[in-house]
């Protein structure tokens, strides 16, 4: 019988997940299909019940349901609970189990372009929202010891850090302080929406003086090269946009659902083609 997978959110028409996952199913000769489901906030509980009753094998969760869905699941993985959000649900042994592959997907994407182990790096996160939180706890989970957070409102960065693991050395910084000290970091990760289309002329951090070999990553993928990435490239940095994070988090969800590892390069090429790259 054909296995059913999907994604729930609102809006959902723009989602690239169906194209990416259905191509992977076809490429691996799997009898499965992935659909996008528009779910209103007030209907979330009923939608989750319905998906479970239909025997869905797994599904992704996107805006605005990543936090609210947690109360409707049977189990939540420890890292997802720490992050406080779920983006992937596995239907296993009659239970809906929530995971968060956003942060781990980003970590895998980052590892793919870093010559050295991430555990040896000093990292700066820009922003203190949901994406930053997922990345922060996932970096800590793989053993990164030095992670600072810069945010427009420093108190929000402090709140994020307050839940950190004891073995992580973290500081909450103003954006001005981060700009002054940017040369101290091996990796800078931009997690806000600043610089996203159509406001492409903006950047949360003016890149001025990076150390040699710095990696600058931006979770935005529209445009492919944001202002912060363009400025970093001019400084000789290694740059990475948000396509890698999107692909790696999707590939990890696919692996959790099916036990099969999809072709990352194929997924990335497909997504870039869909985005016009």
Swiss-Prot record:
Please list the reactions this protein catalyses.
Answer: shikimate + NADP(+) = 3-dehydroshikimate + NADPH + H(+)
Enzyme Commission code:
1.1.1.25
UniProt keyword annotation of Oxidoreductase present: yes
The pathway to which it is assigned is: Metabolic intermediate biosynthesis; chorismate biosynthesis; chorismate from D-erythrose 4-phosphate and phosphoenolpyruvate: step 4/7
Amino acids binding shikimate: 15-17, 62, 87, 102, 221
Q: Which GO terms describe its cellular component?
A: cytosol
Indicate which residues the UniProt annotation says bind NADP(+). 127-131, 151-156, 219, 242
Q: Which NCBIfam families match?
A: aroE, PRK00258.3-3
What does the record note on quaternary structure? Answer: Homodimer.
- Similarity-based family: Belongs to the shikimate dehydrogenase family.
Q: What is this protein called?
A: Shikimate dehydrogenase (NADP(+))
| Name of the gene this protein is made from | aroE
